[in-house]
């Protein structure tokens, strides 16, 4: 047995005297001495390893301290950014309300100044950040290239820093902070396998930092860090919950909250600047947009058996959605609360701006050339806010790589074995689920809301022209000037020409309002028609303003003589369909078209009051209709997911467009070859009537219930179950203005002079807006 001990000790380690002619003798004392030497050797090795492990533990503790400090600073910056965004939003809301009270020439100057304030170029941003870095470099008093370095001498105390110190932190955290979620997964994976060995090896009270700092270290003390990771996750969840609650409150309270304000008080709709085809990315982090209290109220205030937006027991009676609940939209924010004005470099813009422009400049909005996952954190513009801490925290590190500090940060990260990343986003696949991932945003890194769809189905974000929101005939915003308390859900509205009377259709009657005197709170007359329990679905005035045609959830159409001393029904048209969903009048006032619940389009001779023809083609209810200005072509949309055009001279179908969603509304541009379609899936699509090209617009969050073109043809409005009124530029859909009401907006109309908009909503009222140019 003792002889076998010689096999334990390689001769290369402890050579012994050896004579080839004599046998090898091994005594017990020599073996003990050899064992003692080996023990001392192992003890020395153990001591050396222990020192190295203690050194590593010390480094880990130091790095963990740095990590926590960066996290606290990032959180502080996030809070500061949120605060500044809120300040900017409120200031811009004040500006939007004050500007209309200025004289016309001053209005133009102020509006131009505000617009200039939004045009921040990359050169200006680089100069501003360079000044901040230089000031910070001088204040720290050391010569290192990055103001916040891993060396303790360059670290500020773990407190919330002022906004001025953000640049250095952003630069370095773009490399360190972006991967904050990776160590947690890595440590959990190794935790079970290494726990037993780690427990018997080095016992240290230090807390483990990021697991990827030393890739060659196989046996790490992960037990302590695992608990720290759980604690870290818990803190992040608490922060997220706090931010989500704030965001939802802001959505309800800081937009245009009709329920919390005097209905008669004029208010400007949020005057954002959607020149750039981008929108807030924070909303996109949520998979299912929660139903706000306002939408719940709107649903509860709308009779489920009658309203256009809810399902009925019989699908043939009322056009309905395939689903009673609004489709969750994550690719479109709540307009009015999350659409952010874009910053686009303007060629030739001088670096200096006037004091008003500089005071209105939106902070922390850095355009980034990367596509969506590497975009900037969405700043809150005139009516935007940060609603998701996840997006805000991740986006906090995504500063433009053109800044020199980012390169230094990458070098600092490389010293710790990390790849120099720019704003790694662990949830980038969740950002824009409804928009193909191969689509990049416009310059600025924000996902677009307007897309051009080519003939082969390729979607590309639309670059808006410089005159998208300026020029004759393009409104700046709309101001609510009157509320007409109808008393029932208002499913139909129309405005007289000239603009004096508004007709609102509810349950069993049409009420007539004189809006030339805003003080009038009562209708001037009430036209009882259909049955008392049946909803009016459409009412149309003949061009002379003397005749009103009313249709709804009944088989008859009522023709009213408004020129009589007392308005009276002069005729009724009876069809075989149980309901009429929409009406259109020919330009010569001789023919009326009605969309029937059985899918047919009935053509009525108004002079002889007879049915002269039926267009058959829709396999489900025909829900919406419009007619070309020359009276030769008719467009209809249906619940069979199709839009069809009809030749009125030949009485035949011309075209058919198939969609994947039910069609709830449409409008034909009075001056051009464009047809806008509002759908159940919350999209608005603008089709060219002779070419396969089209535009797809994403700002609504639920069904698009009504749509109307301005008579100039340069813009149109759409309303939806998401309580929103959106105004769009024809045809590419730049968002001109948005207004949020307190309930679903079921119907709308625009006056002939394009100066007034009227909407009918689920909270039993109609709202009159003045369009401000």
UniProtKB/Swiss-Prot annotation:
Which stretches are tagged as biased composition: Basic and acidic residues? 183-202, 215-252, 273-289
Ranges of compositional bias, category Low complexity: 203-212, 290-305
Gene label: TLE4
Tell me yes or no: is Nucleotide-binding among this UniProt entry's keywords. no
Q: What name is this protein filed under?
A: Transducin-like enhancer protein 4
Which stretches of sequence are listed as region CcN domain? 205-274
**Where do the WD repeat units fall?**
485-523, 531-570, 575-614, 617-656, 658-697, 699-738, 740-773
Q: Which residues carry this modification: Phosphothreonine?
A: 318, 325, 327, 334, 340
User: What organism, scientifically named, is this protein from?
Assistant: Homo sapiens
**Which parts of the sequence are annotated with region: Disordered?**
1-22, 140-162, 182-360
Location relative to the cell: Nucleus
Annotated segments matching region Q domain:
1-136
Query: PTM N6-acetyllysine: at which residues?
Result: 237, 281
Amino acid composition bias (Polar residues), ranges on this chain:
317-328
Q: In which tissues is it expressed?
A: In all tissues examined, mostly in brain, and muscle.
UniProt record similarity statement: Belongs to the WD repeat Groucho/TLE family.
Q: How is it modified after translation?
A: Phosphorylated. PAX5 binding increases phosphorylation. Ubiquitinated by XIAP/BIRC4.
**Molecular functions per Gene Ontology:** chromatin binding; DNA-binding transcription factor binding; transcription corepressor activity
Its biological function?
A: Transcriptional corepressor that binds to a number of transcription factors. Inhibits the transcriptional activation mediated by PAX5, and by CTNNB1 and TCF family members in Wnt signaling. The effects of full-length TLE family members may be modulated by association with dominant-negative AES. Essential for the transcriptional repressor activity of SIX3 during retina and lens development and for SIX3 transcriptional auto-repression. Involved in transcriptional repression of GNRHR and enhances MSX1-mediated transcriptional repression of CGA/alpha-GSU.
Task: Give the main localization category.
Answer: nucleus
Has the keyword Ubl conjugation been applied to this entry? yes
Q: Which UniProt keywords apply?
A: Acetylation, Nucleus, Phosphoprotein, Repeat, Repressor, Transcription, Transcription regulation, Ubl conjugation, WD repeat, Wnt signaling pathway
Could you give the domain comment from the record?
Answer: WD repeat Groucho/TLE family members are characterized by 5 regions, a glutamine-rich Q domain, a glycine/proline-rich GP domain, a central CcN domain, containing a nuclear localization signal, and a serine/proline-rich SP domain. The most highly conserved are the N-terminal Q domain and the C-terminal WD-repeat domain.
Q: Which GO terms describe its biological process?
A: cellular response to leukemia inhibitory factor; negative regulation of canonical Wnt signaling pathway; negative regulation of transcription by RNA polymerase II; Wnt signaling pathway
Which InterPro entries does this entry report, sorted A to Z?
Groucho/TLE_N (IPR005617), Groucho_enhance (IPR009146), WD40/YVTN_repeat-like_dom_sf (IPR015943), WD40_repeat_CS (IPR019775), WD40_repeat_dom_sf (IPR036322), WD40_rpt (IPR001680)
- PROSITE patterns with a match to the protein in the record: WD_REPEATS_1, WD_REPEATS_2, WD_REPEATS_REGION
């Amino acid at each position: 047995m003792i002889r076998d001990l010689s096999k334990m000790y390689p001769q290369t380690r402890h050579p012994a005297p050896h004579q080839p002619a004599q046998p090898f003798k091994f005594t017990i004392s020599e073996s003990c001495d050899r064992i003692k030497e080996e023990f001392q050797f192992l003890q020395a090795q153990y001591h050396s390893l222990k020192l190295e492990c203690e050194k590593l533990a010390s480094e880990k503790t130091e790095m963990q301290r740095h990590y926590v400090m960066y996290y606290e600073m990032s959180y502080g910056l996030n809070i500061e950014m949120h605060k500044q965004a809120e300040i900017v939003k409120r200031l811009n809301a004040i500006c939007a309300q004050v500007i209309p009270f200025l004289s016309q020439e001053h209005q133009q100057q102020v509006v131009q100044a505000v617009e200039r304030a939004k045009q921040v170029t990359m050169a200006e941003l680089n100069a501003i950040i360079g000044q901040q870095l230089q000031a910070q470099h001088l204040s720290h008093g050391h010569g290192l290239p990055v103001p916040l370095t891993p060396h303790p001498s360059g670290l500020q105390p773990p407190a919330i820093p002022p906004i001025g110190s953000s640049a250095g932190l952003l630069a370095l955290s773009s490399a360190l902070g972006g991967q904050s979620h990776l160590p947690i997964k890595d440590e959990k994976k190794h935790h079970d396998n290494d726990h037993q060995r780690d427990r018997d090896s080095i016992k240290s009270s230090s807390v483990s930092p990021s697991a990827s700092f030393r890739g060659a270290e196989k046996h790490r003390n992960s037990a302590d860090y695992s608990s720290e990771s759980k604690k870290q996750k818990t803190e992040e969840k608490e922060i997220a919950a706090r931010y989500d609650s704030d965001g939802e409150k802001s959505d309800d309270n800081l937009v245009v909250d009709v329920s919390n304000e005097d209905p008669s008080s004029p208010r400007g709709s949020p005057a954002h600047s959607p020149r750039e085809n981008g929108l807030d990315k924070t909303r996109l982090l949520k998979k299912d947009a929660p139903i706000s209290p306002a939408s719940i109220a709107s649903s509860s205030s709308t009779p489920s058996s009658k309203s256009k937006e809810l399902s009925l027991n019989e699908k043939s009676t009322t056009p309905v959605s395939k689903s009673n609940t609004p489709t969750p939209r994550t690719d479109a924010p709540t307009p009015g609360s999350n659409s952010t004005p874009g910053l686009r470099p303007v060629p030739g813009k001088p670096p200096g701006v006037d004091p008003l422009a500089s005071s209105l400049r939106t902070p922390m909005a850095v355009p980034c050339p990367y596509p969506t996952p590497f975009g900037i954190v969405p700043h809150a513009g005139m009516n935007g806010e940060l609603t998701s801490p996840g997006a805000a925290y991740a986006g906090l590190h995504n500063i433009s790589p053109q800044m020199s500090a980012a390169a230094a940060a990458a070098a600092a990260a490389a010293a710790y074995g990390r790849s120099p990343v720019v704003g790694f986003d662990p949830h980038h696949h969740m950002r824009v689920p409804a928009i193909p991932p191969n689509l990049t945003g416009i310059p600025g890194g924000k996902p677009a809301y307007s897309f051009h769809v080519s003939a082969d189905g390729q979607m590309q974000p639309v670059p808006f022209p410089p005159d998208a929101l300026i020029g004759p005939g393009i409104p700046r915003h709309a101001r609510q000037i009157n509320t007409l308390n109808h008393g029932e859900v208002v499913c139909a509205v129309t405005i007289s020409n000239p603009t004096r009377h508004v007709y609102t259709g509810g349950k069993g009657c049409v009420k007539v309002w004189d809006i030339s005197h805003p003080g009038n709170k009562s209708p001037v007359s009430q036209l009882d028609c259909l049955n008392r329990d049946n909803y009016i679905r459409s009412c149309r005035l003949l061009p002379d303003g003397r005749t009103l045609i009313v249709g709804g959830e009944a088989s008859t159409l009522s023709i009213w003589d408004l020129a009589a001393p007392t308005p009276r029904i002069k005729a009724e048209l009876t069809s075989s369909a149980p309901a009429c969903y929409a009406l259109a009048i020919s330009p010569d006032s001789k023919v009326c078209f009605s969309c029937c619940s059985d899918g047919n389009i009935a053509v009525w001779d108004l002079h002889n009051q007879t049915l002269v023809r039926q267009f058959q083609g829709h396999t489900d209810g025909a829900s919406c209709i419009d007619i070309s200005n020359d009276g030769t072509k008719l467009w209809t949309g249906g619940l069979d997911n199709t839009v069809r055009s009809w030749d009125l001279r030949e009485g035949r179908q011309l075209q058919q467009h198939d969609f994947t969603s039910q069609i709830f509304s449409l409008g034909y541009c009075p001056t051009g070859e464009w047809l806008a379609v509002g759908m159940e899936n919350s999209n608005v699509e603008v089709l060219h009537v002779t070419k396969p090209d089209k535009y797809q617009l994403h700002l609504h969050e639920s069904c698009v219930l009504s749509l109307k073109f301005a008579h100039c043809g340069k813009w149109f409005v759409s309303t939806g179950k998401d309580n929103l009124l959106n105004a769009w530029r024809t045809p590419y859909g730049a968002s001109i203005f948005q207004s949020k009401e307190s309930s679903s907006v079921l119907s709308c109309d625009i006056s002939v002079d394009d100066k007034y908009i009227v909407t009918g909503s689920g909270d039993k009222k109609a709202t009159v807006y003045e369009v401000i140019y």
